[in-house]
């Protein structure tokens, strides 16, 4: 729904109240991937024709990106689980700080705006406080493509160099396989003049989804999902209809929750090979995994400790490190969790220890000795994935837990507690109302339950 004028709404301080030691049973519907949907929304800026995105998740991050596009002049219509995007009336090439603050994915817009209009101004990105995520690779790549870039007072100002009206193809070798840089440079190169080669590119499924959609729009992108991606620039891109891939992180979170509670569930739809690193570790820890078509079933009893080390795809995803750490707290034996992607992604460790876990942290490595159970507590999640980990810990624990900081959780999990409740977990969202004024794009709720959650 597009809100055309200011209206009164409610900003709610919320918590999840969890009665622990429950079990999960049933089927979980997995939503569209947040990390894919965000970059697909940004890529709609590359065309003057309508884009229809299917399987868009209902998340606060998606709303933020919708508001950014609306501010640029894009018309958005949400209907029947589809989002229609009409970018024909884009009139602004600058993103305001108040809209992009807290949404790192907003920076993806710079590549699309620069290559389409010849210039762009985008504030430095925000997002979860999980450590330094520099944009050097984005900037260096855009400069190599022919942009002049300066950063003034937190604003990245980019303009095509000289009197040219197009970026030019080039060879770019990334120092590390950055997902954001790969996506930004793919979008920028899609309308550049000539061929661009991106070496040491990220291989994540969300990048493959972006390339698939851009090719539907008329782009010429080859070898997405490989370490070297080739883009032959085209003069213009058209419209298309595209279905967002399933969210592998949401899927993995539910599989881990089932393993942690000795439960049996089925998740669908998923793309099983996107989850191979996760299902392999769950099998190693004692769970039985069955794959049939686009569904994965898990049966879990006793869990034993296993070691994981996060890595770029196809390795173990950093976004599931915190939930898997929660699982290992009650595993038999010892385990070691090594975080290699972000230097500040262990914020959940001291909170799990408060619940009775036995974890020693040495910089980016957590050494865990499994305990029989955890104890319910009131805790505040500090970022998206640590919040999910605390909810899993609350389900494991004896007694009642109240998990706060749901503004982080709602950035990445659609209707999380209602799905858990449907699976048999005793969990309730509690509200504390206060009013504010808003004028924002909102994706319509997909069920009566979500409507009730948002009702004033």
Curated annotation (Swiss-Prot):
It catalyses: phosphoenolpyruvate + UDP-N-acetyl-alpha-D-glucosamine = UDP-N-acetyl-3-O-(1-carboxyvinyl)-alpha-D-glucosamine + phosphate. UDP-N-acetyl-alpha-D-glucosamine binds at residues 104, 319, 341. It comes from the Bacteria. The active site is at residue 128. Its main location: cytoplasm. Pfam families: EPSP_synthase (PF00275). The modification 2-(S-cysteinyl)pyruvic acid O-phosphothioketal is found at residue 128. It is found in: Cytoplasm. Its EC number is 2.5.1.7. Gene3D superfamilies: Enolpyruvate transferase domain (3.65.10.10). Pathway: Cell wall biogenesis; peptidoglycan biosynthesis. Keywords: Cell cycle, Cell division, Cell shape, Cell wall biogenesis/degradation, Cytoplasm, Peptidoglycan synthesis, Pyruvate, Transferase. SUPFAM superfamilies: EPT/RTPC-like (SSF55205). InterPro entries: Enolpyruvate_Tfrase_dom, Enolpyruvate_Tfrase_sf, MurA_subfamily, RNA3'P_cycl/enolpyr_Trfase_a/b, UDP_GlcNAc_COvinyl_MurA. Phosphoenolpyruvate binds at residues 34-35. GO terms for biological process: cell division; cell wall organization; peptidoglycan biosynthetic process; regulation of cell shape; UDP-N-acetylgalactosamine biosynthetic process. It is an enzyme of class 2 (transferase). GO terms for cellular component: cytoplasm. GO terms for molecular function: UDP-N-acetylglucosamine 1-carboxyvinyltransferase activity. Belongs to the EPSP synthase family. MurA subfamily. Cell wall formation. Adds enolpyruvyl to UDP-N-acetylglucosamine. This is UDP-N-acetylglucosamine 1-carboxyvinyltransferase. It comes from Prochlorococcus marinus (strain MIT 9312).
């Amino acid at each position: 729904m597009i809100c055309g004028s200011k209206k009164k709404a409610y900003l709610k301080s919320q918590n999840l109240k969890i009665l622990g030691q429950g079990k999960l049973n049933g089927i979980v519907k997995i939503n569209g991937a947040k990390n894919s949907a965000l970059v697909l929304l940004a890529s709609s800026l590359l065309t003057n024709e309508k884009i229809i995105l299917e399987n868009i998740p209902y998340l606060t991050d998606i709303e933020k990106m919708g508001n950014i596009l609306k501010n640029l002049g894009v018309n958005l219509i949400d209907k029947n689980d589809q989002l229609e995007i009409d970018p024909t009336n884009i009139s602004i090439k600058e993103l305001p700080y108040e809209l992009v603050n807290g949404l790192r994915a907003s920076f993806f817009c710079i590549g699309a705006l620069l290559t389409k209009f010849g210039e762009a101004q985008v504030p430095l990105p925000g997002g979860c406080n999980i450590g330094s995520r520099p944009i050097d690779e984005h900037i260096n790549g855009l400069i190599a493509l022919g942009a002049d870039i300066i950063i003034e007072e937190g604003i990245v100002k980019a303009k095509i160099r000289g009197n040219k009206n197009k970026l030019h193809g080039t060879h770019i070798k990334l120092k590390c396989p950055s997902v954001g840089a790969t996506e930004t440079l793919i979008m920028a190169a899609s309308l550049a003049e000539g061929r661009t080669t991106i070496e040491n590119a990220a291989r994540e499924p969300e990048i493959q989804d972006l390339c698939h959609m851009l090719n539907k729009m008329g782009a010429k992108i080859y070898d997405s999902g490989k370490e070297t991606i080739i883009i032959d620039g085209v003069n213009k891109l058209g419209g298309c209809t595209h279905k967002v891939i399933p969210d592998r992180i949401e899927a993995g979170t539910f599989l881990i929750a089932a393993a942690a509670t000795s439960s049996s569930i089925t998740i669908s739809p998923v793309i099983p090979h996107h989850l191979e690193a996760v299902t392999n570790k769950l099998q190693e820890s004692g769970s039985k995994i069955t794959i049939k078509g686009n569904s994965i079933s898990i049966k879990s009893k006793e869990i034993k400790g296993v070691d994981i080390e996060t890595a770029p795809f196809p390795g173990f995803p950093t976004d599931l490190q915190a939930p898997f750490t929660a699982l290992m707290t009650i595993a038999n034996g010892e385990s070691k969790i090594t975080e290699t992607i972000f230097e500040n992604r262990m914020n959940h460790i001291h909170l799990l220890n408060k619940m009775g876990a036995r974890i020693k942290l040495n910089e980016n490595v957590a050494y865990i000795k499994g305990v029989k159970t955890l104890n319910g507590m009131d805790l505040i999640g500090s970022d998206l994935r640590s919040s999910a980990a605390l909810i899993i810990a609350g389900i494991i624990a004896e007694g009642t837990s109240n998990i706060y900081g749901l503004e982080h959780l709602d950035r990445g999990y659609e209707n999380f507690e209602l799905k858990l409740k449907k699976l048999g977990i005793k969990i309730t969202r509690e509200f504390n109302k206060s009013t504010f004024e808003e004028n924002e794009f909102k994706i319509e709720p997909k069920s009566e339950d979500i409507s009730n959650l948002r009702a004033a």
